[in-house]
Amino acid sequence: MDLFILTRFILFLSFFMKSIHCQYSESQESGHNRNAPDKELTTEEFQLIFHQSQTVDIEYDFINITTEMIETERKVSFTIDGKEYHLSLTPAASQSVLPYGTKIKSAIWWTDNDTHIHEEDYSDERWDSRAIYENLEIMATILVRTENGTSYYDGVFVKYSNEGVRSLPGRLMNIYGANYHFVYDSNGSVYDVVLNGQDEPAVPADMASKIIFYSETPCTCRLLIIQDLLMKTSRRLSSISTIFWNAVNLRFRPVQHPKVNIIITGIVIAKNEAAFQHVYRARYSKNSKLVHTGRVIDNGRYFFGTNFDPYYDNYDASFTMASMDDPTGKGGATVIGGICSSSNNIAYIRDVGSYSGVKVATHELGHLLNGQHDSDTTCSEKINDNIYTIMAKQGSTKASKFVWSSCTLTAFANFSKTTSAACLKDTYRKQ
């Protein structure tokens, strides 16, 4: 009798465990990450690929990319959620935003209560325009590295929800091969803080004929990038900047009157937590992982005037990129029309290195070029449920398309005719 009961119990337990296993398998297969590799990612690999800790819930797919080279065009195909994608990637139409020879420095906070800037012995000619490929249809910017005959794709496509593309780290590449890549969701906040700092009015109509060339002369925005992203190498941060700012540059391609181009004239990388005092002093006292976005701009006016004049004199605006959250959800801050002003040419964006800040960086540069929130103009910020404007006050992360409004395009054109935009006509680039 005891043996009979024991046998029944074992059979029941076996059936129960099998049922639980089936339920678990079904739930795994129905999840978004059903194409995850069967080898579990290590903590270091997860951080390297997604730029965040494993405690963060990230939606991603593990895909096999097939490529074909036809002259200078790369044909790329892959499948996500049963849907096939076929992209044509062409070499970037313009010079890379990060030319070979761009100054890269490090910043360290020393015990003398000051930030010291040091030259970094690092640059990489492989990240010039020949390595950047793009697709205007889905606003894709891809950095292609070719090593030993194998191509690796890292980048972002931002027409729809921000999607990052990442090649595999060494261990996984040895297991799965170089054709496998991760595609992951990298959407970030598009809610920001703006200040009106423009102090020079538009040029009077009777003087317009003297500077009419301004409206058609391309505007070159020379940017100094401040990277407060610790635990990343100079090589990796330079790669991130190349992809990130080429993606922003691509978003400005539809702007034609005047054309707007981005060039990075310097990168400064934080080497310790207090290196960038304008960010460090904007943190919340009760939680140092949170930052008050508006204070970064206020603090920056002093910080850049004190620490950067001796090192850099060839930039129209600085963009600080940091990974700290703002408890109010703000993803960026800047000053309207401040790009050529020595005290207002400051912008801040949140990005952890995953390209989640591409949209807000485009938005903030639009503000610096005197674009306002469309809700504050006669233009609607929502075309329909699927299309929002880039300068929407609080854009939708579910929109399938983002466009420049007619109000913003007019603001850019008018601003380019003023003395407040004079620096954008200067193509000087100090080597």
From Swiss-Prot:
Residues 228-428 form the Peptidase M12B domain. Zn(2+) binds at residues 363, 367, 373. Residues 1-22 form the signal peptide. Expressed by the venom gland. The keyword Metal-binding applies. GO terms for molecular function: metal ion binding; metalloendopeptidase activity; toxin activity. It is found in: Secreted. Binds 1 zinc ion per subunit. Disulfide bonds join 340-423, 379-407. One of its GO terms (biological process) is membrane protein ectodomain proteolysis. The keyword Cytoplasm does not apply. The recombinant protein has gelatinase activity. In vivo, injection of this recombinant into fifth instar L.oleracea (host) larvae results in partial insect mortality associated with the molt to sixth instar, with surviving insects showing retarded development and growth. Monomer. This is Venom metalloproteinase 1.
